[in-house]
């Protein structure tokens, strides 16, 4: 975090950073590269570039008033800075309790009704562009209000590099909101003045004397074609080209964060120590993004589950050098049968090494490709690497030029589409980086094993021996 703050200083773009509130996102269910407590948060909030506490994802810890989370929230409140939320699925009394803890915004909007309830609860609602399938419904709900409130803002959330280069970030979200029926001037207001209100920055968001001149010049108010960009009063881009030269990095990049040895096919097995051979009923994770438990009867050979033909495998391996537990593997359902493998070190929110596939040999090849690159993502099919892109900076970022990263990512996504069949809106490439987010309700696989975000349990794959005649049922 300190590196990101230092690296942003002096760039021709204003970076407003927030302190990471949930490292890890689900304590006790996963291990991250560090454990942030109140002391670390206090130190980060003291930095002038840090505007507040980043999204508080551990909703359960807030609602149960866990000492760790109460300490983090108290540090943020004492700093006088804003606290961002992650209130996915919260409603009624639970939403009110979450907001009462000092959290004042949410971007995890799941419907139009959800957006309206959170606005009425006094939260700032941040419409995110990463869930495009929800935006038409949310815009329709907003249009039922007598006015567009100042507490309605806009954000991007995750944006992949090829999309960012081709269509842009915030400007693309605004274009889509306008296309879905939001008045252009209201959309622009949400992204400028309203966002400045949210950040408690009265020096931003206005075209007025005495304010900071972070400005864009548009050729029209519907397609929002950007002609010029000014940052802090300086022209930094014109005609879609930078006019200011970027300086070289001032410090060494944080690399070598893949702290694990190469893996073998034997590491990608669902181990069942309760049974050497025979048949067993085991837990599986059904679905993408919004997951639920299922139970599947499988053959067991030498203490390992035999993969049923309609299921696939998911493996998570701790990569930060803080655990000796080894790879954790689970059956996944609802993804179809993988025809290859995909591995990545970019996996919310602890960003351990995550691998998907059906063939342990191909899964090992994909995983080892990522390990050798020092982080990144790789697609394997027919025991050949179809595509890969390196993220050597913390296993999350590339040091290459944006156009190169965009090209590599596009090839990666196209290759991934050859080994798994996408089914929008949930079974998408984006979902591959979110399946480990154990703070959300339902089952997830982390570096500690099968977890339940609703009950905060870590569960074994083995459920029981089957009844006679075999079975398969939802759990």
Place the predicted regions along the sequence by residue.
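Divalent-metal coordination cores built from histidine and acidic residues
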Residues: 1-80, 385-390
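Residue-level marker for buried hydrophobic side chains located in beta-strands
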Residues: 17, 154, 356-359
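Short, glycine/serine-rich, charged loops/turns that create anion-binding
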Residues: 22, 57, 159, 321, ...
């Amino acid at each position: 975090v300190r590196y990101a703050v230092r690296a942003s200083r002096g760039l021709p773009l204003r970076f407003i950073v927030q302190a990471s509130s949930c490292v890890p996102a689900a304590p006790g269910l996963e291990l991250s590269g560090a454990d942030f407590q109140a002391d670390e948060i206090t130190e980060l909030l003291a930095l002038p570039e840090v505007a507040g506490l980043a999204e508080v994802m551990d909703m359960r810890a807030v609602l149960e008033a866990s000492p760790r989370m109460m300490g983090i929230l108290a540090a943020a409140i004492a700093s006088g800075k804003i606290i961002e939320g992650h209130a996915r699925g919260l409603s009624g009394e639970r939403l009110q309790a979450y907001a009462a803890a000092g959290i004042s915004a949410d971007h995890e909007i799941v419907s139009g009704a959800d957006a309206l309830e959170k606005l009425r609860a006094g939260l700032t609602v941040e419409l995110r562009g990463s869930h495009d399938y929800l935006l038409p419904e949310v815009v329709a709900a907003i249009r039922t209000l007598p006015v567009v409130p100042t507490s309605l803002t806009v954000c991007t959330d995750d944006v992949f590099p090829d999309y960012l280069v081709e269509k842009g970030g915030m400007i693309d979200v605004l274009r889509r909101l306008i296309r879905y029926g939001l008045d252009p001037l209201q959309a622009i207001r949400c992204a400028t003045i309203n966002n400045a209100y949210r950040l408690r920055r009265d020096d931003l968001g206005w075209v007025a004397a005495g304010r900071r001149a972070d400005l864009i010049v548009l050729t029209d108010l519907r397609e929002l074609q950007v002609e010029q960009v000014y940052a802090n009063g300086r022209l930094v881009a014109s005609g879609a080209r930078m006019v200011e030269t970027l300086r070289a990095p001032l410090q060494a990049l944080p690399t070598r964060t893949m702290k694990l040895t190469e893996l073998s096919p034997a590491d990608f097995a669902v181990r069942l120590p309760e049974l050497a051979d025979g048949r067993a009923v085991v837990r599986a994770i059904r679905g993408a993004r919004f997951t639920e438990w299922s139970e599947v009867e499988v053959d067991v050979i030498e203490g390992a589950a035999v993969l049923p033909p309609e299921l696939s495998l998911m493996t998570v391996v701790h990569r930060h050098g803080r655990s000796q537990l080894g790879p954790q593997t689970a059956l996944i359902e609802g993804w179809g049968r993988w025809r290859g493998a995909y591995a990545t070190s970019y996996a919310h929110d602890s960003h351990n090494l995550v691998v998907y596939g059906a063939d342990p040999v191909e899964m090992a090849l994909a995983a080892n490709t990522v390990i050798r690159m020092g982080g990144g993502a790789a697609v394997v099919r027919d025991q050949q690497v179809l595509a890969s892109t390196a993220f050597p900076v913390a296993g999350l970022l590339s040091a290459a030029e944006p156009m190169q990263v965009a090209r590599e990512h596009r090839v990666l996504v196209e290759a991934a589409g050859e080994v798994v069949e996408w089914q929008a809106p949930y079974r998408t490439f984006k979902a591959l980086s979110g399946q480990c987010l154990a703070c959300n309700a339902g089952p997830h696989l982390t570096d500690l094993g099968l977890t339940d975000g609703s009950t905060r349990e870590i569960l074994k794959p083995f459920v029981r021996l089957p009844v006679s005649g075999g079975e398969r049922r939802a759990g």
